[in-house]
Amino acid sequence: MTTVPGPNAALRPTRRHDPNYKWIALSNTTLGVLMAAIDGSIVIIALPAIFNGIQLNPLEPGSTSYLLWIFMGYLLVTAVLVVAFGWLGDRYGRVRMYNGGFLIFTIGSVLLAATPFMGTAGALWIIAMRIVQGIGGAFLFANSAAILTDAFPTNQRGLALGINGVAAIAGQFIGLLAGGFLATIDWRLVFFVSVPIGIVGTIWAYLRLEELSTTTKRKMDWWGNITFGVGLASILVGITYGIQPYGSDPTGWTSPLVLSLIGGGLLLLAIFLWIEQRVAEPFFDLSLFRIRAFAAGNIASLLAATGRGGLSFIIVIWLQGIWLPVHGYSYADTPLWAGIYMLPLTAGFLIAGPLSGYLSDRFGARLFATGGMLLAAVAFIGLTGLPVQFAYPTLALFLLLAGLGSGLFNSPNAAAIMNSVPANQRGAASGMRAVFANAGFVVSIGLFFSLMIAGLAGSLSSTLYAGLVAHDVPVDVATQISHLPPVSSLFASLLGYNPMASLLPPDVLKALPPDQAAILTGKDFFPSLISGPFHDGLVIVFLVAAGMSIVAAIASALRGGKYVHDEAPAVAKDLATH
């Protein structure tokens, strides 16, 4: 491998010692990562408005796939492409790749806001443009941390990456609030909100960011790139379809398609590992995983992201589909209020993230990352004890603890990972770090939705049947509705949607006593009915998330002491890899 000067090599000495440049790099990359993170979650809570806007019934056969791909397509693309785009940053310039990502993301946002189609065509257009957004987001995620690591001295990287990491995680929570607010005005604003930010950020990035690193003249490892990308994509797509019904099963984990996708993906990743150990210039240097801080940090990141993603989705479902309607909120208003009621989670992260990043520069990452995951585990365990109809201050306390735990963990963990690798590997390392975080978010959807569906499947059918018959619905109609797949009930709750008005035939509703018909189609009946089965799944979900947080804490504790590759003597570097 040959090292060659980057396109702006002459500027490096001036920029590197310009005290203002590092803050320019931090502010722009933080804006880019914040924008990309917001768009990863903003559609979750705005899906009812989006489906209404394109005139598509979310409970119609086939709509589940559109619903999943509208918010999963973006996450899948960013998870799959970040390592490749980090490699491109090492090869052609991190700033160049980052700037291109800002531009692509902005174009995707414009095309989403201008969606010209309705119905199925509209859903397919949104999915395609979300994938375009995801490509831009992958460039941003893959190169932002490497740009900051180049710009900041080692004693300030924890603070810089902490602020950047706060933007990445807080953006997921801010997206929920923004989606709920904008959806009440116009569904297109959910996508348009990124356009002015993207335009300003793109122009700013092209004018002010400069390459500080040297580029590496490396041959493209095509087979490694293909096997990794296709293998990871296959697994994540398989997980996406695994939560949909298959035949008489409530989930699709026994489907030949799902098994083939996941099995084929695992095989391709095994081939990827075999290839990378044999090519002269690998797509990703697997020896980085011999660095204890890098390996332990990424394992902890995967587990933390999985638990955090599960928390976001399950709390949204809990609030939007059950708690808010029962407490008098109209279905039209539940997206906004669900975002508002989740603010303690965001507040905890915003408080702890920068502070832990700053302190980790002095004391190392292990104490803060380990303590943060233990605090998150306490929050998850506390959530298992909440009744379905909880007192909000209690929920707010546990959300605050979860946010504080995530904030304590994320910033020091990110800095420790990036500090542990050589300078010429920062792009690929940043990409791999993003893979673990983004893949964890996707895995959380498949894992926790499946656990919720399993919890619902045990008693949902009998509960629905008993509730309908008790309100004078004919036995044959009640029997038919009681076979509603658990995933449909879950998505109805996620969308803040009362399915009874569309599930009960018009002639049946007309024949019922007016008071009974009003109860069945009112905002209390469906949420109250499914709250018992929902709680069964809820306890399982939070216990699993608590277990993941504890394992992440163990991985964090085993990462070793403070270690910076650029400052470590040769002996220390060798010891750190064993």
Question: PLM ranges: what are they?
Answer:
Residues 81, 93-104, 109-112, 116-125, ...:
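C-terminal module of multi-pass small-molecule transporters
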Residues 28-31, 35, 104, 111, ...:
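Hydrophobic residues within membrane-embedded alpha-helical segments of Major Facilitator Superfamily
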Residues 2-206, 356, 383-384:
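Transmembrane-helix bundle of Major Facilitator Superfamily
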Residues 1-40, 274, 293, 361, ...:
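Transmembrane-helix exit segments and adjacent C-terminal regions of multi-pass membrane proteins
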Residues 26-75, 256-260, 268, 279-414, ...:
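Transmembrane core module of solute transporters
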Residues 50-51, 88-89, 178-184, 239, ...:
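Interfacial helix-cap and linker-helix signal at transmembrane-aqueous boundaries
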Residues 115-120, 187, 208-211, 243-244, ...:
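Short helix-capping/hinge motifs at transmembrane helix termini and TM-loop junctions
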Residues 185-299, 307, 577-578:
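Hydrophobic transmembrane-helix bundles of small-molecule transporters
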